[in-house]
Amino acid sequence: MSTPYTPAPQIFNLFKVLAVSLALIAAVEYFKYGTRINYEWFHCTPVMERVGGPDSSVLKIWARGGPSCDKRGEYKTILKRISRDYEPNDEHLSFCIKENMSVDPVHYPIHEDKGEPGYIAYVGYDSDKRTVDELCEGTTVFHF
């Protein structure tokens, strides 16, 4: 007569899998914490300056950052900021993006002096369209 099969307890395997999972989660959180402290080193940060007085909706936008913030990163950051900050359902939007041709496409501003921005955008609602048109003279003005 044989004894019935009884599976071995798997509790130790469960603890091993749980420990490895928690270690991976901790590693990801530590990386996120480290990059948050040095965010500017890894990403482009938008810089905004109001143009045309306190009641104006017109902003001058450019991007700054560390080595990964080249012209492509600046462009993406500027467009992302325009699309998030302005609501075209409230009022139509006009903007232009001027390229600084004296800045190389791939530039690595490692030091505190980031140099000139590769792109500068002027954006505002159509109630301030005249100001946007003046600032964007010589470039294409886009509308949302």
Swiss-Prot record:
Q: Which residues cross the membrane?
A: 10-32
**A GO BP annotation:** ceramide biosynthetic process
| Keywords, comma-separated and alphabetical | Endoplasmic reticulum, Glycoprotein, Lipid biosynthesis, Lipid metabolism, Membrane, Signal-anchor, Transmembrane, Transmembrane helix
Sorted alphabetically, the Gene Ontology cellular component annotations on this record are: acyl-CoA ceramide synthase complex; endoplasmic reticulum membrane
UniProt subcellular location: Endoplasmic reticulum membrane
Q: Name one GO molecular function term.
A: sphingosine N-acyltransferase activity
Topology relative to the membrane, per the entry?
Single-pass type II membrane protein
Residues listed as glycosylation sites in the UniProt record:
N100
Q: Lumenal compartment: which residues? A: 33-144
Presence of keyword Lipid metabolism: yes
- Residue ranges that the UniProt entry lists as topological domain Cytoplasmic: 1-9
So what does this one do? Component of the ceramide synthase complex required for synthesis of ceramides.
Recorded family membership: Belongs to the LIP1 family.
Give the quaternary structure: Component of the ceramide synthase complex.
Q: What is this protein called?
A: Ceramide synthase subunit LIP1
Q: What is the lineage of its organism?
A: Eukaryota, Fungi, Dikarya, Ascomycota, Saccharomycotina
Q: Which gene is the coding source of this polypeptide chain?
A: LIP1
